[in-house]
């Protein structure tokens, strides 16, 4: 996840495509899932094109969308999840169908506060699952799937490597969008957001507990990395790079760093998966 910081992950994935590295299981959360589908559909450069072409387009994101009573989201929902993938920068549904593995997106059940892991398929042409995994509190309305409201998967499971192991993976590559040593903290704005969700107490709890869970997850990840069970790829620094970054030079630099790291580690990853 990490909104536009995920352009780092896009660089890594494009490098892996170049080196023909494709795992048989992919799980993503928030933007990690929304951009990850283009990895499974083998469309290098697609995510970068979308961000560069539309990051400063009001139809894509902006306060006007949030204030629109028919949209109620910082992103233009129809534009981002229908017009772009189905018309402007087409998503290759046929190629995704050829993907030999399984692709999951993490969503958070608004009523229980628990993570749910939804399998993405091309039957979901409205991209409901991708909307739900990206649905940040306040910036998105609740996204309903089968009459159940959902929000961003990062609220309940920010780094879903444990689910990968539970589902039978024995070797996992984790791509993070924060630098080594990063620790998440509970800010005053997060506490205010939690109060705003008083009608959904389990979401309020998720918001308050998220930083602690995230940091605990990182600690466990470090141990697994030392044990050789995971490979972790992350940027050197995200300082000065906003979640909703619009500076195209910064975006390109972050993508290039991800691509370079992906190329550098591709041999190790290929060997890791071949064990």
Task: Please annotate each region the language model reported.
Residues 1-29, 37-275:
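Patatin-like phospholipase
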């Amino acid at each position: 996840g990490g909104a536009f910081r995920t352009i780092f992950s896009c660089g890594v994935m494009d490098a892996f495509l170049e080196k023909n590295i494709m795992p048989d299981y992919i799980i993503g959360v928030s933007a990690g899932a929304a951009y990850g589908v283009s990895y499974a559909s083998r469309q290098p450069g697609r995510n970068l094109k979308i961000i560069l072409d539309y990051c400063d387009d009001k139809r894509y994101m902006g306060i006007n969308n949030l204030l629109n009573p028919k949209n109620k989201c910082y992103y233009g929902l129809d534009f981002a999840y229908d017009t772009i993938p189905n018309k402007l920068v087409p998503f290759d549904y046929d190629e995704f169908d050829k993907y030999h593995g399984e692709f999951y997106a993490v969503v958070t059940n608004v009523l229980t506060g628990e993570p749910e892991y939804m399998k993405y398929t091309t039957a979901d042409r409205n991209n409901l699952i991708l909307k739900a995994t990206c649905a940040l509190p306040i910036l998105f309305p609740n996204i309903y799937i089968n009459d159940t409201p959902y929000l961003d998967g990062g609220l309940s499971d920010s780094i879903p490597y444990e689910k990968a192991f539970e589902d039978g993976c024995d070797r996992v590559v984790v791509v993070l969008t924060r630098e080594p040593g990063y620790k998440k903290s509970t800010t005053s704005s997060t506490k205010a957001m939690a109060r705003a969700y008083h009608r959904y107490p389990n979401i309020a709890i998720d918001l308050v507990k998220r930083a602690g869970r995230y940091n605990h997850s990182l600690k466990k990840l470090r141990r697994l990395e030392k044990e050789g069970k995971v490979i972790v790829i992350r940027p050197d620094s995200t300082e000065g790079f906003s979640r909703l970054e619009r500076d195209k030079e910064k975006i390109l630099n972050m993508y290039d760093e991800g691509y370079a790291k992906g190329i550098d580690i591709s041999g190790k990853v290929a060997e890791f998966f071949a064990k």
